[in-house]
Amino acid sequence: MGIDKRAEATAKDVQGKAQEAWGDLTDDPKLELEGKAKQVEASAEHKKEDLKDQAHRTIDNV
């Protein structure tokens, strides 16, 4: 299990949310989109780690 990878993904998600909110607050659509993109990246990283964990569990049960 990649706890470090999950922590990095969570940090990226929080950073993306903050960046999106700041972009909204300052009426900067580019900054908002960059924040949303970071959140999508973080979500993908979490899903990747979920799949890796599931694969390890499946292998352990064989």
From Swiss-Prot:
Location of region: Disordered: 1-62
Biased composition (Basic and acidic residues): 1-15, 27-62
Record-linked InterPro entries: CsbD (IPR008462), YjbJ_sf (IPR036629)
Pfam families according to UniProt: CsbD (PF05532)
Gene3D superfamilies hit by this protein: YjbJ (1.10.1470.10)
Disulfide bridge partners, by residue number: none
Similarity comment text for this entry: Belongs to the UPF0337 (CsbD) family.
Name this polypeptide is given: UPF0337 protein gsr0040
Organism from which the protein derives: Gloeobacter violaceus (strain ATCC 29082 / PCC 7421)
